Regions:
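Non-catalytic, conserved peripheral segments adjacent to functional cores
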Residues: 1-100, 106-109, 113-117, 123-145
Length: 145
């Protein structure tokens, strides 16, 4: 049986500063200046976890792989408005299997209630992710609040 704990172990994930679990799985060898052209991670949120509000200085593509659906909230401005996109498998019901978040957009994610107890996605960042380009908002902050 696939559980969050099993996937965390099998995928060799580590705690992520924004919440959840991750592991970088790819970084493009080509570089633009001192930065890779793109990078990718596995990212897993357990049912009780969330990806806290943060922004990245690069475009980010979220790709849903398994588990429960995920609500991805995002805003181009710290003043709002906040938009929500549901990532998941049921495209007929309106789920999106992937979504692009623009560079410098505020974003947050939370698994939706379901039977699996986790959500597994990949995040592809271009140009490649650097922690120096990552900003984590204060606890309980949200755009427009």
């Amino acid at each position: 049986m696939r559980t969050a704990k099993t996937l965390i172990e099998e995928l060799r994930l580590s705690p992520h500063p924004e919440g959840g679990w991750y592991r970088e799985v790819w970084r493009a060898p080509e570089e633009e200046g001192e930065r890779a052209l793109a990078s990718a991670i596995y990212f897993l949120l357990e049912a009780h976890q969330r990806s806290h509000w943060h922004k990245v200085d690069a475009a980010e593509i979220w790709l849903w792989h398994g588990g429960d659906p995920l609500m991805l909230s995002h805003s181009v401005s710290p003043r709002g408005p906040v938009r929500e996109v549901r990532l998941g498998p049921d495209v007929i019901a309106g789920d999106q299997p992937q979504v692009v978040i623009g560079a410098h957009e505020w974003q947050s994610a939370v698994p939706l209630p379901g039977t699996e107890g986790y959500t597994l996605v990949s995040c592809v960042v271009t140009p490649g992710f650097k922690f120096s380009g990552f900003t984590l908002a204060p606890p309980d902050w949200r755009p427009g609040a």
